[in-house]
């Protein structure tokens, strides 16, 4: 065989790369889906499984069986791979469908309540049966922002200081502090509300400040634990280099470690805010509810978005329920924005 013939054969034969997933053709993907759909329809008709949930269960089970049989045409490893891929996809869909259903339900039912005045008016002169074109949640939106701002001023500094003590100072009580913080993460929100009610509200009155203190108790462990994990990601070489240059532990912490972890600490703060933004139980016992716009955070009740939703649902009229759904849509949007900021800050942390 000549050199030219050998070269041409080598050019035609391409080396296989089994570590790279081969793209499946449309036919390979559509065939199992089509067969599983037919089997699912037959199962639903025969067994009487009702509704989309019954069809979904039948489809997942059918698709697992069909994927295994289809994979056995090649080999056992291929069959197991197809089954595991199906299980992972089904798990993702099972988690995603309820979440998407909640969002669609909230925004669909609350859409009719949302208009421009919904964000500029309060409920001071609006009754429960008044038209949806009257009233709004500006008082609740402003109240929530005030309560969350005050809670952040308490929880974020203390949470970061706690994380610094655990990861940087590593005092003899750091283990105890870590256990306490972890235990606080499991405290029911109503317990935090009862605690502030007994200490503050019973002696003075319902107020936005009392609500902020209750939310700060719930927010602090989230900020502390997330900040601890962020500070652990700071390379040890940075600390060693600072100490080698003669920097003290305080200077190293505040000039090297914290600036390096700044984006991650912002993420921790945003996650803490998102954790408490929708809490209702502690606000029932602390801030309560007011139908009027107010910036006063002491001496009187202060409205908030969770309490606005709760109050309208408790009223029970059709228009009040629609306003509650509208408030829920605004609250979900607010929390979604917080998570977007957390993700953006997290990218900076990874860099």
Where are the regions a protein language model picked out?
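Generic hydrophobic transmembrane alpha-helix motif, especially the helices
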Residues: 182-215
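Periplasmic/extracellular loop-to-transmembrane helix junction in inner-membrane transport proteins
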Residues: 12-15, 19-22, 44-50, 71-90, ...
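Transmembrane alpha-helices
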Residues: 249-287
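Transmembrane alpha-helix signature in integral membrane proteins
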Residues: 52-62, 134-164
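Interhelical loop and adjacent transmembrane-helix boundary motif
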Residues: 283-332
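Transmembrane-helix boundary motif in ABC transporter permease subunits
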Residues: 69-77, 151-181, 194, 343-347
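C-terminal transmembrane helix and the adjacent membrane-cytosol boundary/short C-terminal tail
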Residues: 67, 231-232, 267-270, 311-351
């Amino acid at each position: 065989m000549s050199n030219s013939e050998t070269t041409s054969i080598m050019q035609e034969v391409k080396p296989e790369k089994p570590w790279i997933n081969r793209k499946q053709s449309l036919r390979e993907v559509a065939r199992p889906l089509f067969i599983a759909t037919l089997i699912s329809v037959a199962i639903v008709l025969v067994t009487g499984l009702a509704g989309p949930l019954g069809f979904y269960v039948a489809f997942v089970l059918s698709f697992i069986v069909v994927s295994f049989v289809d994979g056995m045409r090649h080999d056992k490893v291929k069959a197991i791979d197809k089954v595991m891929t199906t299980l992972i996809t089904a798990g993702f869909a099972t988690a995603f469908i309820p979440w998407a259903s909640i969002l669609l339900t909230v925004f669909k039912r609350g859409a009719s309540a949302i208009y421009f005045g919904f964000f500029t008016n309060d409920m001071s002169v609006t009754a429960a049966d008044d038209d949806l074109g009257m009233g709004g949640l500006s008082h609740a939106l402003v109240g929530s922002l005030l309560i969350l701002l005050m809670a952040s001023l308490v929880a974020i500094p203390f949470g970061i200081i706690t994380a610094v003590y655990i990861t940087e100072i590593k005092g003899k009580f750091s283990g105890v502090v870590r256990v306490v913080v972890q235990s606080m993460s499991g405290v029911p929100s109503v317990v935090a509300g009862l605690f502030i009610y007994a200490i503050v509200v019973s002696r003075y009155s319902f107020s936005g400040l009392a609500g902020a203190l209750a939310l700060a108790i719930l927010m602090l462990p989230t900020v502390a634990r997330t900040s601890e994990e962020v500070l652990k990601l700071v390379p040890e070489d940075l600390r060693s280099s600072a100490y080698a240059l003669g920097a003290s532990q305080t200077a190293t912490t505040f000039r090297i470690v914290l600036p390096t972890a700044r984006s991650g600490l912002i993420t921790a703060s945003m996650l803490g805010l998102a954790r408490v933004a929708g809490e209702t139980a502690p606000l029932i016992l602390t801030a309560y509810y007011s139908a009027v716009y107010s910036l006063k955070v002491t001496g009187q009740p202060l409205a908030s978005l969770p309490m606005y939703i709760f109050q309208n649902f408790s009223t029970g009229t059709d228009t009040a329920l629609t306003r509650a759904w509208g408030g829920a849509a605004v609250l979900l949007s607010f929390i979604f924005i917080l998570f977007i900021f957390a993700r953006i800050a997290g990218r900076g942390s990874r860099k």
